C-alpha cells in the first residue's frame, strides 16, 4: 500500500486514489487517453464510481466519490426519536412514558417426540 513511483516518475498512493499512469492500474490508463484534458468527468473504473480529476498536465487521478447517506426506512420515525430526551436509565428502571410490557404466559413444556 505504500507509495511507489509510477511511469511518469510521480508517486501513486493507491490506497486513496487510482493513478491512471500507475502500472498497477494499467488497464485503466486507456480511459485517461480517451478523457484527455477534461476537468471532472464521472467514471466507473473497476466497480468504483468516482470523478476523473485533471487539474493540469499532471497525471489524471480518480478519487472515489462518497456514497449518499442512507435514508431511514420510515421517515416519520426520526422525528419521533429526535423529540425524546436522551437520558439513559439504569438497567431495570422503566420510564414513566414507556408502555407497560405484556404479561408473559408460561406454556406447558412438550415431552420428547417419539
Curated annotation (Swiss-Prot):
Presence of the UniProt keyword Membrane in the record: yes
Record's protein name: Protein ORF3
Residues covered by region (Hydrophobic): 6-22, 33-53
Motif annotated as PTAP/PSAP motif, chain positions: 96-99
Family indicated by similarity: Belongs to the hepevirus ORF3 protein family.
Region Homodimerization, and interaction with host AMBP/bikunin, annotated ranges: 72-114
Assembly information from the UniProt record: Forms homooligomers. Interacts with host SRC, HCK, FYN, PIK3R3 and GRB2 (via SH3 domain); binding does not activate the kinases. Interacts with host AMBP/bikunin and AMBP/alpha-1-microglobulin peptides. Interacts with host HPX/hemopexin. Interacts (when phosphorylated) with capsid protein ORF2. Interacts with host TSG101; this interaction plays a role in viral release from the host cell. Interacts with host SIRPA; this interaction down-regulates the phosphorylation of host IRF3.
Function text: Small multifunctional phosphoprotein involved in virion morphogenesis, egress and counteracting host innate immunity. Plays critical roles in the final steps of viral release by interacting with host TSG101, a member of the vacuolar protein-sorting pathway and using other cellular host proteins involved in vesicle formation pathway. Also acts as a viroporin and forms ion conductive pores allowing viral particle release. Impairs the generation of type I interferon by down-regulating host TLR3 and TLR7 as well as their downstream signaling pathways.
Major localisation: host cell
